Amino acid sequence: ASVHEFLVK
């Protein structure tokens, strides 16, 4: 997973 996914999730 990417940093963006971490923030969205």
Swiss-Prot record:
Report where it is expressed, by tissue.
Answer: Expressed by the venom gland.
CC annotations in GO: extracellular region
Keywords per UniProt: Mast cell degranulation, Secreted
Q: What is its main location?
A: secreted
Keyword Secreted: yes or no?
Answer: yes
Where it sits in the cell: the answer is: Secreted
User: What functional role does this protein have?
Assistant: Mast cell degranulating peptide.
Name of the molecule in the record? Venom protein HR-3
The organism named in the record is Vespa orientalis (Oriental hornet)
